[in-house]
């Protein structure tokens, strides 16, 4: 029988000092035999996806204490990728994932907490907490802040849906008037919550649900809707049940590694491919799998990407649907239901509610449930009122979207495409693989051949695009932006956005060892591995070199003679200490970022730390 971890600090005369300090936090004698449960919040006023979380930790804590536990809340940092985008701040985004994971470990282990509820939402916060949960392997439940309502505005006598990406594209489009650009900007992000499309934050919250570590509805129920409150209240009650099951009944099925198994990771990846999730999810799933000692690799992702069709199309791949529409159609469970009916899912998985996949689908799939309360939950809709308050409205759709032929979520026979929304490409330019969000690629661009325009920073590429130096047919190559070379693996949202702004979104390709925002669409290929800073071939590409891209065949190739490449490699190594570094880039890199770069692996490993460099 496992012993409560917290007993280390609450039992025995040698812990009198620790108990004295616990008493100063409000604990009493009656509390010293109870499980201590960490409420891991990520409230910050910097991030719209987190601005409403201040009081939600208290909701969870009250339920924990009412159920027989002791709740202790702490906060992590949270970087807003959209605000950090397009300048040096983006260097800090991906490294913050590791910092969040470490800080959760530090707090939970330093204070011997028995379990935790993770209140996350945006891009690197959910992955960082997920890595920590699988690393620590103590009972854990995730409950996120929820998605933002889609923006809406009237242009040319037509009501259109909007999000952050529209504001960025139209803001740089010289054909859009100042008045219209200002109107779009003011309408794009109307409420608290994670940005309204299938961007990284919402993708990861959906995947956490598919992994079984959060409750049904977590990935899609709007931040503003009153129904979301129940997820927080139930998380507080349920974590105490899981904690007691593990420590008092020796039931390790309550642990994250027992829930997020290889089968669960495969289901989550199948969901990701089916819904055309952010390419960043590949990084984060690979990183989380390593923390949980799950043998889940790029080879698995490649295999699954060839089997799973595209069943759910959401912004930025279309402006017709946002997360509020996914929820109306049944959310994550609705998509999983269609995958299960096609015989594609692993059924031997469970979630934090203790339900296996079939039980979950029977109860929560809108296409088969008889539970009216579930149908009511999935009818939760937007109010269209600007607010930063959670649970501030209770509007409902007049009906659910159960149209699996032409609706937001499709059945297998009416898939948006037979190929899924993500693909792994291999070739001499990316021998360890690279990722493309096929859900956002125009059908006419699935194969592409063109000359390279090479840039060694995102900033130089942006200047070239806006300065008219990139033309139709070009393959824009941005290198030395990987985990090590950046450092920090910046998102290339501005280059892809500005290609659209200048009318080149469908006539150019972009390849990088950096990564892309979940808001990216178009022929944008990222995570090229090995990266330039690790001696990858992308570091040898020169202007005018021809690059072949074939998404249906999963190939990417630099069409340059091997003898020429060998000569270029010799020249590069001849640079000595400066080899495999940018030739002309001025960038201030802090000590913190240099420390991250010194241990960073390439994207095919999840950009996690290279443990071989740490010894032991």
UniProtKB/Swiss-Prot annotation:
Xref: Pfam families: ILV_EDD_C (PF24877), ILVD_EDD_N (PF00920)
Record's cofactor remark: Binds 1 [2Fe-2S] cluster per subunit. This cluster acts as a Lewis acid cofactor.
Function: Functions in the biosynthesis of branched-chain amino acids. Catalyzes the dehydration of (2R,3R)-2,3-dihydroxy-3-methylpentanoate (2,3-dihydroxy-3-methylvalerate) into 2-oxo-3-methylpentanoate (2-oxo-3-methylvalerate) and of (2R)-2,3-dihydroxy-3-methylbutanoate (2,3-dihydroxyisovalerate) into 2-oxo-3-methylbutanoate (2-oxoisovalerate), the penultimate precursor to L-isoleucine and L-valine, respectively.
Cofactor: [2Fe-2S] cluster; Mg(2+)
One of the record's GO molecular function terms: dihydroxy-acid dehydratase activity
Domain of life: Bacteria
Manganese recorded as keyword: no
Entry binding sites for [2Fe-2S] cluster: 122, 195
Family: Belongs to the IlvD/Edd family.
Modification N6-carboxylysine occurs at: 124
GO CC annotations, alphabetized: cytosol
Regions crossing the membrane: none
Protein name per the record: Dihydroxy-acid dehydratase
Binding site for Mg(2+): 81, 123-124, 491
Catalytic activity from the UniProt record: (2R)-2,3-dihydroxy-3-methylbutanoate = 3-methyl-2-oxobutanoate + H2O; (2R,3R)-2,3-dihydroxy-3-methylpentanoate = (S)-3-methyl-2-oxopentanoate + H2O
EC number in record: 4.2.1.9
Source organism (scientific name): Photorhabdus laumondii subsp. laumondii (strain DSM 15139 / CIP 105565 / TT01) (Photorhabdus luminescens subsp. laumondii)
Pathway: Amino-acid biosynthesis; L-isoleucine biosynthesis; L-isoleucine from 2-oxobutanoate: step 3/4; Amino-acid biosynthesis; L-valine biosynthesis; L-valine from pyruvate: step 3/4
Gene Ontology process terms (BP): isoleucine biosynthetic process; L-valine biosynthetic process
Quaternary structure (record): Homodimer.
KW Metal-binding (keyword) present: yes
Enzyme superclass (EC): lyase
Keywords per UniProt: 2Fe-2S, Amino-acid biosynthesis, Branched-chain amino acid biosynthesis, Iron, Iron-sulfur, Lyase, Magnesium, Metal-binding
Active site positions: 517
